[in-house]
A protein has these predicted regions:
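A short acidic, glycine-rich active-site loop
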Residues: 37-54
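Ligand-binding beta-strand-loop-alpha-helix segment within the catalytic cores
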Residues: 59-69
């Protein structure tokens, strides 16, 4: 997914491989008995070997794909807490790309929702969460609630320059047509000021429940989504819409709360 954008901007892609020793060494409560420690040590050794082999394989695949696309690239291998490492590295990179259904392999992170929430709470943003299979981005749907965080998200997206040739639609959910018209007009003006013409749409109902079906009906390839203000207070980082998308969306997500 990132190859076309990287080629267009001459960007460098950095592949991050993280080994978490604490996770690999955890074997659960151990009963007392002869041979238990040896068995646990053997299990840890097997895990370490498997992870090392998988990292090497993934790194070679990443490098091969980058070379084929003529994209600058390098691989960084780190040891430690994946969240702390990601939070540190994001200071020196423009964007983080993670899997939509799992950020790290080998069961390092059990829940994608909690993992993304923790990453964003530590300042890892923007995040492009993608599926397992490559999907060309031909149509981009921006969900705009009118909140400050929602506006920040689409502003991040515009400034990134991603998918500049893809048609963009900004949709607002809610029952107040006048409020929707005002917000959509201002959002469209921001896009226009940065050289991007967008179409807008107002839908009744709620983004929490209707955004995914709307995106699929419009045949969107990417959803740009932020928060609602009330849910920001309740969830601190993610609103209900973002959490629902992370759990259920079959489409790639651009998140920058």
């Amino acid at each position: 997914m990132m190859w076309p954008s990287a080629c267009a901007t001459a960007a460098e892609l950095v592949g991050l491989a993280v080994t978490d020793p604490l996770r690999l060494e955890w074997t659960g409560p151990r009963p007392m008995g002869i041979g238990v420690s040896a068995a646990s040590a053997d299990l840890v050794r097997q895990r370490q070997q498997r992870v090392a082999a998988d990292i090497a394989k993934a790194g070679e695949l990443f490098a091969t794909r980058c070379r084929a696309a003529n994209v600058q690239h390098r691989i960084t291998e780190e040891t430690g807490d994946p969240f702390e490492i990601a939070a540190d590295l994001v200071r020196y990179h423009d964007m983080c790309v993670f899997g939509l259904r799992g950020l790290f392999e080998h069961d390092v992170v059990p829940e994608p929702r909690d993992a993304l929430e923790r990453l964003v709470s530590q300042g890892v943003r923007p995040i492009l969460a993608v599926g397992e299979r490559y999907r060309p981005i031909r149509r981009v749907l921006v969900a705009y609630s009118g909140s400050l965080e929602s506006a920040k998200t689409f502003k991040h997206f515009v400034h990134s320059g991603l998918y500049a040739d893809a048609p963009v639609r900004v949709v607002h959910f809610g029952d107040d047509a006048q409020v929707a018209a005002r917000r959509l007009e201002k959002a469209a003006a921001f896009f226009a000021a940065h050289g991007r013409v967008v179409e807008t749409d107002h839908e009744g109902g709620s983004a929490d429940h209707d955004l995914l079906s709307y995106a699929e009906a419009w045949k969107a390839d990417l959803i740009v989504a932020g928060n609602s203000a009330k849910n920001l207070l309740l969830r601190r980082v993610f609103g209900e819409t973002a959490l629902r998308l992370i759990r259920e969306s079959p489409l790639p997500l651009y998140l920058a709360q």
